[in-house]
Design a protein with these regions (language model features):
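N-terminal glycine-rich dinucleotide-binding loop that anchors FAD/FMN and/or NAD(P) in oxidoreductases
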Residues: 44-61, 201
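Rossmann-fold dinucleotide-binding core
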Residues: 112-197, 203
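Residues at the starts of beta-strands that form the adenosine-phosphate
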Residues: 3, 26-28, 108, 128, ...
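N-terminal glycine-rich phosphate-binding loop for ADP-containing cofactors
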Residues: 202-223
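NAD(P)-dependent Rossmann-like dehydrogenase/reductase catalytic/cofactor-binding core
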Residues: 218-340
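NAD(P)+-binding Rossmann beta1-loop-alpha1 motif at the extreme N-terminus of oxidoreductases
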Residues: 1-52
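Rossmann-like NAD(P)(H) cofactor-binding subdomain of soluble oxidoreductases
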Residues: 53-145
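Nucleotide donor/acceptor-binding cores
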Residues: 2, 72, 107, 155-157
Length: 340
């Protein structure tokens, strides 16, 4: 039987562990820092639209306590900027029991990060990489509490072998996620599904840190998405469409009054907690790929630069610092003029 080792106790990792706990799927939540220690000592307060409950989770804060086995699947739920360190930490740990895997590097790895960089990073250390595109409206801003507002299922997941392919393990992971309550499926073209999620992340995530007239915010969001679509097109990637899902998702959404607030997505939450953000691997990924494929990306470049400046040490001492959309528009137009 598979056991899922979940590395990272944030919104995605802890909610995944909670769903596994509630549905009898073998798992272990691994992490470091205050959150995992709190979970070990007190469990977690897991808030869903149907109510809140306190859960004891199987958790590990010390690698020396962990024995890897042949049936383990490693699930890295850290943000992309932290993934390389996590891969280095875990790849060369020994695997117990008789079987083909001698070190963790030979065990299958699941990467549900936003963007397109995680799988490429993981391949440097792991031979079996499975990408995942996950849509789980979740909030982690308070120690020991995770809010998940997806309803009726906590989230939507697509799994596939990277860079392409659909096999028995991918199908098995998707089946386990369905047992855990998610609406999940395996597909052979995981890059297309991750590309579709990247467009959404690029359009909305970093823009939560800016304020101004709604029409200008919407226009900027549209420009971010248009640049992402152009870059992906230059790469030969056609993003997946919602109607391609094998399961209907027309019934699914964010429950009203569930604690998931507009304008407070993962980047806003990270900065609110004083943690690092992933904008360099979202908008910054579009900028990087645009440079490689000869596509101008001034709007994504401007917001990447602006978020980097907003998040300099000492800038967020009074909470989440916000930029102004008019200044951001001016910066993007200046970059576009230089490129033109």
């Amino acid at each position: 039987m598979k056991r899922y080792l979940i590395f990272g106790a944030g919104a995605i990792g802890a909610s995944l562990a909670a769903q596994f706990e509630l549905n009898g799927i073998p798992y272990l939540l691994c992490g470091r820092g205050e959150q995992i220690r709190h979970i070990q000592a007190h469990g977690i307060r897991y808030v869903r639209p149907e109510g809140a409950r306190s859960l004891g989770l199987q958790a590990c804060a010390d690698r020396s306590e962990l024995v890897l086995t042949q049936g383990d699947v490693l699930v890295f739920t850290t943000k992309t900027q932290d993934l390389e360190l996590a891969c280095r930490d875990w790849a060369w740990l020994p695997v117990a029991g008789s079987g083909p895997a001698r070190t963790a590097s030979e065990l299958p790895v699941l990467t549900p990060q936003n963007g397109l960089a995680a799988e490429r990073i993981a391949l440097r250390w792991f031979s079996q990489v499975y990408g995942a595109s996950i849509n789980t409206p979740a909030r982690y801003t308070e120690l020991g509490q995770i809010v998940v507002g997806g309803y009726p299922e906590p989230g939507l997941v697509v799994v596939g072998r990277y860079p392409q392919g659909e096999d028995e393990l991918a199908a098995g992971i998707a089946a386990d996620l369905c047992r855990a309550g998610y609406l999940a499926e395996s597909r052979p073209d995981i890059l297309r599904w991750k590309a579709a999620k990247l467009i959404s992340s690029v359009r909305n995530n970093a823009l939560d840190l800016f304020e101004g007239p709604s029409d200008r915010l919407q226009a900027y969001a549209a420009a971010l998405a248009q640049e992402a679509i152009a870059v992906l097109g230059a790469m030969g990637i056609s993003p997946a469409r919602a109607q391609e899902r094998r399961h209907s998702v027309s019934h699914w959404g964010i429950a009203p009054g569930c604690g998931i607030e507009p304008g407070q997505q993962s980047t806003w939450q990270s900065i609110a907690r004083g943690a690092s953000h992933e904008v360099d691997f979202l908008n910054g990924e579009i900028v990087r790929l645009g440079r490689l494929y000869g596509v101008a990306t001034p709007f994504n470049q401007a917001i990447q630069q602006a978020v980097g400046q907003l998040c300099q040490p000492g800038r967020s001492a009074q909470g989440v610092c916000r930029g102004q959309i008019d200044q951001l528009l001016s910066a993007a137009r200046e970059l576009a003029a230089r490129a033109g």
